[in-house]
Amino acid sequence: MIEIPSDLHKDLVPLVFLLGDWAGAGVHDFPGAEKCNFGQEVSFTHDGRDFLEYQSHTWVLDNDGNKVRPLESEHGFWRIDANRKVEVTMTRDDGVIEIWYGELADQKPQIDLVTDAVARTAASQPYTGGKRLYGYVKSDLMWVGEKQTPEVELRPYMSAHLKKVVTPEDVERWAKALPDDMPDDGIAFFK
């Protein structure tokens, strides 16, 4: 269920499908790096201003799905203009700072992004740019990331399937919104 918070900046309504906490798993595979399954937690929040704040933490999973060690972390800010153009500024824990531009698709919750600028610290690994695709499919958030380095052409390196995290506060809020005249069997149909 997608809810539009009353204090959400009006410009962000097209991105409302991103809001909330997400968790799931994916695959990481890039030449010269460890191939692994990973877990991920993502958060998109807002404070009433004209951007979403984004945080992502990933970790390597063992064969039983247990956390082994951190993989990557990102923090950024997402904006959208009246023409559905999306702008993202992002800082990664590996010493890379990126500016991404893209577009929200017409008639579907899908965002295509491509890097416009990349800045790297001396300690970071070689990286020259990337692409990302985010999509909201059947109430889940899915994404795929591509990257390139001076030695490797643009190719997919990470993808994940995330589920919305439901908190006890969400359940309580939804329960309070139920009608008082619920049938005894607990089944109700809403118009």
Curated annotation (Swiss-Prot):
It comes from the Bacteria. A motif (GXWXGXG) lies at residues 20-26. InterPro entries: Calycin (IPR012674), Nb(III)_bact/plant (IPR022939), Nitrobindin (IPR045165), THAP4-like_heme-bd (IPR014878). CDD domains: lipocalin_heme-bd-THAP4-like. It holds the Pfam family THAP4_heme-bd. Gene3D superfamilies: 2.40.128.20. Belongs to the nitrobindin family. This is Ferric nitrobindin-like protein. It comes from Streptomyces coelicolor (strain ATCC BAA-471 / A3(2) / M145). The lineage of its organism: Bacteria, Bacillati, Actinomycetota, Actinomycetes, Kitasatosporales.
